[in-house]
Amino acid sequence: MYLRSLHLRHFRNYRDQEITFDAPKTILVGENAQGKTNLLEAVELLATLRSRRASRDRELVYQEERQAQIAATVERLGVAHELVMELRSSGRRSLKVDGQVLRRQADFLGQVNAVVFSSLDLELVRGGPEARRNWLDGVLLQLEPAYLGLVEQYRQILRQRNALLKQDPAAAGDKFSQMDFWDAQLATTGSRIMRRRARLLQRLEPLAAHWHRVISGGRETLTLTYRPQVPLPDPQASPEVIQAQFLAEIRAKAAAEHSLGSSLVGPHRDEVELCINGVAARAYGSQGQQRTLVLALKLAELELIEQVVRDPPLLLLDDVLAELDLHRQNQLLEAIQERVQTLVTTTHLGSFDAGWLKAAQILQVQGGQLFPSKTGDGIP
């Protein structure tokens, strides 16, 4: 796929900015807090409908404006599409594809596919389980747009069940009969999420292991293991088998759940274990090794999305390329070649391999405005 153009109105620190992408690689150069990451965030929103930096849409709207707009022209499999996302301070969104307003947000997913690699992604290695769950879910949203509805349904069930757990049994009346209902709902929806996560990781692991071997020169072996909070007998097991296991775990932890007033069983507590040579990756102190691992995960993600949708996704590199040594830069360049459109942000170009700068579109970013870079600008 190819992002032909992007138009940001009242988005973050962009008042009204259009950009046409005219090269496979676009490098955005500027000081911190000028808007480089904001531009990549807009593209990521088109791909996932989620921001990793904002909890509310209000944070995405420029100052006192009431709404922001992200418009893009995207070419997929040789066909151009016009996409529009409107974000309101109230939290209400509207989405359009080729001028048609969409009723469901899930129908927008898949219009843009993107893989993002930023400094935040080092949390995949050194952060808690939530970072790794969010990563898996983000990939699933792009591969299976219907997964969005499943996740939203699970969160709603979890809220209802937690509210019931917090109630005083004496005041809640038929609390326990209600709990049976929500237990069944949690098990049904949670099992569907678990099966999808397990199947995804089965497909990602060999790809990530391959890229990790390539980047590390064959010196290290990477393994990814899904550790669901509910023991999963087999990712291919029937939904009924998994649901029965789920309900058994709920019964085993019933007393603790009622005591704490919180659900202790379900995919909201899953873990993805990352190991290098059989040792938990977080035990490795080297930032170089951590970056190698995350780069392998991102290349696996990129390769899998390309296999499934039959079109290379966009690659968004936010202030990480210059931090990779020349070997890793070259491995990444070799992996994506010219077929993957790449948007890169950086504060300087001095540590870039010449292969990245060759024929790249270089833009200066200053105060929410973009300027074509003159020859030599920003290049020591």
Curated annotation (Swiss-Prot):
GO CC terms: cytoplasm
Organism superkingdom: Bacteria
Keyword Nucleotide-binding listed: yes
One of the record's GO molecular function terms: single-stranded DNA binding
Residue sites binding ATP per the record: G30, E31, N32, A33, Q34, G35, K36, T37
Subcellular compartments: Cytoplasm
Alphabetical UniProt keywords: ATP-binding, Cytoplasm, DNA damage, DNA repair, DNA replication, DNA-binding, Nucleotide-binding, SOS response
PANTHER family: DNA REPLICATION AND REPAIR PROTEIN RECF
Stated role: The RecF protein is involved in DNA metabolism; it is required for DNA replication and normal SOS inducibility. RecF binds preferentially to single-stranded, linear DNA. It also seems to bind ATP.
Family of the protein in this entry: Belongs to the RecF family.
Name this protein carries in UniProt: DNA replication and repair protein RecF
Organism this protein belongs to: Synechococcus sp. (strain JA-2-3B'a(2-13))
Taxonomy of the source species: Bacteria, Bacillati, Cyanobacteriota, Cyanophyceae, Synechococcales
Record gene name: recF
